[in-house]
Amino acid sequence: MAIILGADAHGNALKELIKSFLQEESYDIIDVTDINSDFIDNTLAVAKAVNEAEGRLGIMVDAYGAGPFMVATKLKGMVAAEVSDERSAYMTRGHNNARMITMGAEIVGPELAKNIAKGFVTGPYDGGRHQIRVDMLNKMA
């Protein structure tokens, strides 16, 4: 499984910490960050890379997480969640089959960011009754 990472200038330091953590956990990391671009361009780069292959997940970090969430949810086939706790990160995989999360470096500290990333990438999709909602989301965009 490849994890696609991106950040703007405000989220880059936290993204680098997440990157190191996930590499230590033996995940394949693809960093699409362009530090000279804003959150919109970096979010689009993460989402595009996630959508290029099955089994990819994305994490985008900026100052607050809200902007990248808004961008990601505009894209066809992208189910994304803005998260600031590890349980939500885990559950958005299980119940929503989210392929991307966004978080804010001014909201989430280093240890919490690692736990969020771990919860997201280890969370299995439960399918079943949740697939109805996922299908509804996919029809919207």
Swiss-Prot record:
Record pathway: Carbohydrate metabolism; D-galactose 6-phosphate degradation; D-tagatose 6-phosphate from D-galactose 6-phosphate: step 1/1
Entries under Pfam families matching the protein: LacAB_rpiB
Top EC group: isomerase
Top-level division of the source organism's lineage: Bacteria
Biological process, per Gene Ontology: D-allose catabolic process; galactose catabolic process; lactose catabolic process via tagatose-6-phosphate; pentose-phosphate shunt, non-oxidative branch
Entries under InterPro entries matching the protein: LacA, RpiB_LacA_LacB, RpiB_LacA_LacB_sf
Keywords, sorted A to Z: Isomerase, Lactose metabolism
Reactions that this protein is recorded to catalyse: aldehydo-D-galactose 6-phosphate = keto-D-tagatose 6-phosphate
GO molecular function, one term: ribose-5-phosphate isomerase activity
EC number(s) given by UniProt: 5.3.1.26
Similarity annotation: Belongs to the LacAB/RpiB family.
Quaternary context: Heteromultimeric protein consisting of LacA and LacB.
NCBIfam families named among the record's database cross-references: lacA, PRK08621.1, PRK12613.1, rpiB_lacA_lacB
Database matches in PANTHER family: GALACTOSE-6-PHOSPHATE ISOMERASE SUBUNIT LACA, RIBOSE-5-PHOSPHATE ISOMERASE B
Name under which the protein is recorded: Galactose-6-phosphate isomerase subunit LacA 1
Annotated organism of origin: Streptococcus pyogenes serotype M18 (strain MGAS8232)
The encoding gene: lacA1
